[in-house]
Each structure stands twice: as structure tokens, then as C-alpha cells.
């Protein structure tokens, strides 16, 4: 959603001003899908995922990386003051949304947000990881990264209406499940 300051982020909000290469490619992909849907009648549902996490998460992403570094007694990089907020969405909820989107046939083209529709401050995420790992985090403060946004927050009204999407896993439970997997996979 780029420089959009209105929250939660709705699918109808403008995305024409991305502030990272990743966001630019996502917007371009949606335009390409819209074009193919219009020209060739391809039924297309573009899903906008909000900070997906859970078992088997890529090791370079924040939750997995933080869990590993905390477990190793190493500092975790925190960009800015820790007040950035993310709409963390558990992988099982994303899977439920994807499955519903596969079966959706209400129109030829849709863009739909999939998130938990709740924001969590980075400091709170770190506290949850410390609690579940039963270890303190060492913080390595760093400047904000270019292209990072202060918050992500999904409006999932459309997903609820069109897909029956209803995320079930709140961050507290999701982190507990992630840490259980992390411990078993690291053993």
C-alpha cells in the first residue's frame, strides 16, 4: 500500500505509489492479472497477504530469524525504535483464504486482502518470542530501512464477504505454535 496512511488498508485504496521494489512488483503483477482477465476472460483473484508467519517460515524473515538469534544468545536487529506495527497472519489462516479464493467464482477479477486485521508492535512481538523461548532478547538498534512502512493493517471486510474468510489464530497462539515447531526442527 506504499505511502498510504489510511488504516486499515482497503483493497480500494490507491497502490500507485509503492515505496519498495517488492511493493512495485506486487502492484505490477495485479495490473498484469487485470489486463489478462479483461482481454482473455481469465478468472483471477489476486491475494494481498499481510506478514505471514508460522512453521517452516523462511529463516531470513523476522520471526524465524529472531527466534534463532535469541536461542543462540545473539542480538536481534531492530530497525528504528521498535514501534513499527505489522498485521501478522498465521499460515493456516492464509491457507484457508487461498483455498476459498480458488473456489471463488463471483466475478472475473478481484483483489482481496488476507490478514488477521490486528496490528502488533515490534516490541510486543519480541516480548512474545522471549516469553515462549523463555530467553531474553538482546537488541541491536539500527536505523530504519529504506522502503519500510510504519505499519501494515488489513481490512478483511471483502475477504469475509466474498470468501467467508475468518482468521482463527491470534498472534499469541501463533507464536506459541511457531516456537514449538522451531524447537522440534532445531533439535
Predicted segments, located by residue:
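Glycine/proline-rich active-site loop of Rossmann-fold NAD(P)-dependent oxidoreductases
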Residues: 27, 42-45, 52-65, 72-74, ...
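PAPS/PAP-binding and catalytic site of the sulfotransferase fold
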Residues: 62, 121-133, 174-178
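Short aromatic/basic micro-patch
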Residues: 46, 88, 119, 153, ...
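Amphipathic terminal alpha-helices
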Residues: 171-187
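Catalytic helix-loop patch of NAD(P)-dependent Rossmann-fold dehydrogenases
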Residues: 3-46, 53, 57-59
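Conserved C-terminal active-site "lid" loop/helix of NAD(P)H-dependent oxidoreductases
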Residues: 91, 124, 142-166, 170, ...
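Catalytic Tyr-x(3-8)-Lys segment
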Residues: 17, 83-84, 163-167
Amino acid at each position: 500500500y506504499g505511502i498510504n496512511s489510511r488504516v486499515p488498508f482497503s483493497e480500494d485504496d490507491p497502490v500507485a505509489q509503492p515505496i519498495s521494489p517488492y511493493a512495485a512488483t506486487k502492484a505490477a503483477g495485479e495490473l498484469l492479472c487485470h489486463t489478462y482477465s479483461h482481454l482473455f476472460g481469465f478468472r483471477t483473484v489476486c491475494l494481498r497477504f499481510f506478514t505471514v508467519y508460522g512453521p517452516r517460515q523462511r529463516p531470513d524473515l523476522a520471526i524465524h530469524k529472531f527466534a534463532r538469534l535469541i536461542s543462540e544468545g545473539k542480538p536481534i536487529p531492530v530497525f528504528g525504535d521498535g514501534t513499527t506495527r505489522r498485521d501478522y497472519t498465521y499460515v493456516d489462516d492464509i491457507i484457508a483464504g487461498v483455498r476459498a479464493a480458488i473456489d471463488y467464482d463471483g466475478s472475473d477479477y478481484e483483489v482481496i486482502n488476507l490478514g488477521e486485521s490486528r496490528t502488533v508492535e515490534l516490541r510486543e512481538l519480541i516480548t512474545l518470542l522471549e516469553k515462549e523461548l523463555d530467553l531474553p532478547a538482546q537488541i541491536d538498534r539500527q536505523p530504519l530501512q529504506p522502503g519500510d512502512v510504519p505499519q501494515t493493517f488489513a481490512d478483511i471486510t471483502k475477504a469475509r464477504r466474498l470468501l467467508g474468510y475468518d482468521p482463527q489464530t491470534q498472534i499469541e497462539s501463533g507464536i506459541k505454535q511457531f516456537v514449538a515447531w522451531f524447537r522440534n526442527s532445531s533439535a
